[in-house]
From Swiss-Prot:
Proline-rich region necessary for constitutive interaction with LYN as annotated region, ranges: 70-75
Keywords: Cell membrane, Cell projection, Cytoplasmic vesicle, Lipoprotein, Membrane, Palmitate, Phosphoprotein, Transmembrane, Transmembrane helix
This protein's name: SLP adapter and CSK-interacting membrane protein
Subcellular location: Cell membrane; Cytoplasmic vesicle, Phagosome; Cell projection, Ruffle; Cell projection, Filopodium
Function: Lipid tetraspanin-associated transmembrane adapter/mediator that acts as a scaffold for Src-family kinases and other signaling proteins in immune cells. It is involved in major histocompatibility complex class II (MHC-II) signaling transduction in B cells, where it is required in generating the calcium response and enhancing ERK activity upon MHC-II stimulation. In dendritic cells, it is involved in sustaining CLEC7A/DECTIN1 signaling after CLEC7A activation by fungal beta-glucans.
A Pfam family it matches: SCIMP
Region span, Disordered: 63-94, 110-136
Modified residues (Phosphoserine): S65, S77
Transmembrane segments: 8-28
Tissue expr: Expressed in peripheral blood leukocytes (PBLs) (at protein level). Expressed in dendritic cells, splenocytes and B cells (at protein level). Strongly expressed in the spleen and lymph nodes and weakly in other tissues of the immune system, including bone marrow, peripheral blood leukocytes (PBLs) and thymus. Not detected in the majority of nonimmune tissues, with the exception of lung. Expressed in antigen-presenting cells. Expressed in macrophages.
Induction behaviour: Induced in bone marrow-derived macrophages by CSF2 and particulate beta-glucan.
GO biological process: cellular response to molecule of fungal origin; positive regulation of cytokine production involved in immune response; positive regulation of dendritic cell cytokine production; positive regulation of ERK1 and ERK2 cascade; positive regulation of interleukin-12 production; positive regulation of interleukin-6 production; positive regulation of lipopolysaccharide-mediated signaling pathway; positive regulation of stress-activated MAPK cascade
Length: 150
């Protein structure tokens, strides 16, 4: 019984290879037999869509039309669900830093496509985030501390 345990993965790999070869041989024989009888197989072609390359978009909205959707809030305003009216806004914790928008960013247009100037991907991450990470405990030191508690 120990021989089976010692060579389990080798036996499993050889079994997979053997079964694949047997199935391949069976398919080869069936295809050869079908072609000897004179049957031709046609390659299936995709259905034509009247020459239109249109994308269809579906929204997961029940009983509403696009005209009934509310307008988006201004960019600088906080999300209305985040703060209750009686609460004062909190200061961000030490882990977060402010993000400053780059106003004089050069935009390179490719083949006539342009991006809007007030797009969300034109922000700059300040260099102060690097010093915050160096003040924290490295992952391997925290991991050692966790294992010692068990």
């Amino acid at each position: 019984m120990s021989w089976w345990r010692d060579n389990f993965w080798i036996i499993l790999a050889m079994s997979i290879i053997f079964i694949s070869l047997v199935l391949g041989l069976i398919l080869y024989c069936v295809c050869r037999w079908q072609l000897r009888q004179g049957r031709n197989w046609e390659i299936a072609k995709p259905s034509k869509q009247d020459g239109r390359d249109e994308e269809k978009m579906y929204e997961n909205v029940l009983n509403s039309s696009p005209g009934q959707l509310p307008a988006l809030p201004p960019r600088g305003s906080p999300f209305p669900g985040d703060l209750a009216p009686q609460e004062a806004p909190r200061q961000p914790s030490a882990w977060y830093s402010s993000v400053k928008k780059v106003r004089n960013k050069k935009v390179f247009a490719i083949s006539g496509s342009t991006e809007p100037e007030n797009d969300y991907d034109d922000v700059e991450i300040p260099a102060t985030t690097e010093t915050q990470h160096s003040k924290t405990t490295p992952f391997w030191q925290a991991e050692v501390g966790l294992h010692s508690s068990f």
